[in-house]
A protein has these predicted regions:
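Ankyrin-repeat and related helical/solenoid repeat scaffolds used for protein-protein interactions
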Residues: 156, 163-193
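Compact recognition or signaling/catalytic modules
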Residues: 93, 97, 103, 113-120, ...
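A generic tandem-repeat structural signature
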Residues: 2-53, 58-63, 67-69, 76-77, ...
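Leucine-rich repeat
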Residues: 12-17, 36-41, 60-65, 83-88, ...
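Consensus "Asn ladder" position of solenoid repeat domains
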Residues: 1, 25, 49, 70-73, ...
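The feature encodes a structural signal of leucine-rich repeats
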Residues: 6-9, 30-33, 54-57, 78-80, ...
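Conserved hydrophobic beta-strand positions in leucine-rich repeat
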Residues: 17-22, 41-46, 65-70, 91-93, ...
Length: 193
């Protein structure tokens, strides 16, 4: 499609709306209508648009939001209130232009899937170790030179993808990931494990 905006107040008027998919369109910004448009929504898919920012407070009323897919957009940063998205279970921010992941990511205690592939990340904050329910962490194709030791606290982690980065070594703490099923480490600068 080539939709670039929705009629003012459309989403807010749909009181029973639970899931929104507006992928593969021409949105350059979030739909206008403020936080009330997402009050009862549990899943939002805005994949493959041209959105360059997530407005501060846009999910302040989205108490049921558990899945956000904003892959393949133009995001350069996350909003300062990202730490308030406490019910988020799946967060896909792949293929954007993110260069930094805020420390507040640690507040997303229910997060199980975090996709950050194809961004510009040079480091992952140590607070990542607080995401104790995380099962999937996809960091493929970034600019990471190292992973924090705190990654070893992710005892539920089953899938770790760090392929196509600039890693020279892996933290020994990876040995603590007893539930790890899949580890992808190709195309790095590793000399040993």
């Amino acid at each position: 499609n080539t939709i670039s905006h929705l009629p003012e107040g459309l989403l807010s008027s749909l009181n029973e709306l639970r899931s929104i998919t507006l992928s593969r369109n021409n949105f350059s910004a979030f739909p206008s209508g403020g936080p009330s448009q997402f009050t009862n929504v549990d899943s939002i898919n805005l994949e493959h648009n041209q959105i360059d920012k997530i407005p501060y407070g846009i999910f302040s009323r989205a108490k049921h939001l558990t899945k956000l897919n904003i892959k393949e957009n133009q995001l350069t940063s996350l909003p300062l209130d990202v730490g308030t998205w406490v019910n988020m279970v799946e967060l896909n921010l792949g293929t954007n232009q993110l260069s930094k992941l805020p420390e507040d990511i640690q507040c997303l205690q229910n997060l199980e899937v975090l996709v950050l592939s194809n961004n510009l990340l040079r480091r992952i904050p140590t607070s990542i170790g607080s995401l104790r329910k995380l099962r999937v962490l996809d960091l493929e194709e970034n600019r990471l030179e190292q992973l924090p030791n705190e990654i070893g606290f992710l005892h539920e982690l089953q899938r770790l993808v760090v392929q196509s980065n600039q890693l020279t070594c892996l933290p020994r703490a990876i040995g603590h990931l007893s539930n790890l099923i899949y580890l992808s480490i190709g195309e790095n600068n590793l000399a040993y494990l």
